[in-house]
């Protein structure tokens, strides 16, 4: 993995910082594990914008990732590591002993030729998936389930991980990267290690067009709009004379956004600000 700063051969290249990984496969992805991915432009079925700043971008195929890791007690070999345009992490194509191939998230330290396994009796080794009741306290894991059998939902982006800090009865206590501590059923599956490609956060796109290739449209400040378009719009100068709000008038700084009271009891400590 190398961090490359481009030479300023043009204004658009001047600030570009790229992440170069020579281990990544340079050919086409594995076709049977691809699916179509249609663009919405941030619109719903009525044609109305429901998510701003989405539109355009390069055409992509969705890679079918095995988040469940439910092929138990069958060893697999990592065939290659690949780039995935749909996520910040890289992915690994693994070949199971029975001939099936699947994509998984590529953990840090996993290389082509490594052996991995999922199941209760899998050894504690990077890339192996097993129930958290079988993982030692203090271990670093990723792709953590919230419900047994549902598939990993926590710690899936590049460089992310969760630490198991306690085990009591049917629950384990996890420390998330945000600082939040929460309880999860010990039967839930997690994968050993942290997600790879942690240098992703160091990249610099360098120009607006690179964001447009990714399907991200510009963000316009509310204070630069007219009063008809935003509560901060209009007036003389840049002052809008009120507490900051979203385009729909909802407080935008410090307002609580969590509504799932049903699972509040599993949160031991809130994340730090």
Swiss-Prot record:
Q: Which SUPFAM superfamilies match?
A: Nucleic acid-binding proteins, Translation proteins SH3-like domain
Identify the keywords attached in UniProt to this record, alphabetized: Ribonucleoprotein, Ribosomal protein, RNA-binding, rRNA-binding
What does the record list as GO biological process? cytoplasmic translation
Q: What quaternary arrangement does the UniProt entry report?
A: Part of the 50S ribosomal subunit. Forms a bridge to the 30S subunit in the 70S ribosome.
> How is this protein named in the record?
Large ribosomal subunit protein uL2
Q: Which InterPro entries match?
A: NA-bd_OB-fold, Rib_uL2_dom2, Ribosomal_uL2, Ribosomal_uL2_bac/org-type, Ribosomal_uL2_C, Ribosomal_uL2_CS, Ribosomal_uL2_dom3, Ribosomal_uL2_RNA-bd_dom
What family, per the record? Belongs to the universal ribosomal protein uL2 family.
Per UniProt, the ranges with Basic residues bias are 253-273
Residue ranges, annotated region (Disordered): 221-273
Q: Source species, please?
A: Mannheimia succiniciproducens (strain KCTC 0769BP / MBEL55E)
- Keyword flag Phosphoprotein: no
What does the function comment of this entry state? One of the primary rRNA binding proteins. Required for association of the 30S and 50S subunits to form the 70S ribosome, for tRNA binding and peptide bond formation. It has been suggested to have peptidyltransferase activity; this is somewhat controversial. Makes several contacts with the 16S rRNA in the 70S ribosome.
Q: In terms of domain of life, where is this protein from?
A: Bacteria
Question: May I have one GO cellular component term?
Answer: large ribosomal subunit
From the UniProt record, report the name of the gene that encodes this protein.
Answer: rplB
Q: Which GO terms describe its molecular function?
A: rRNA binding; structural constituent of ribosome; transferase activity
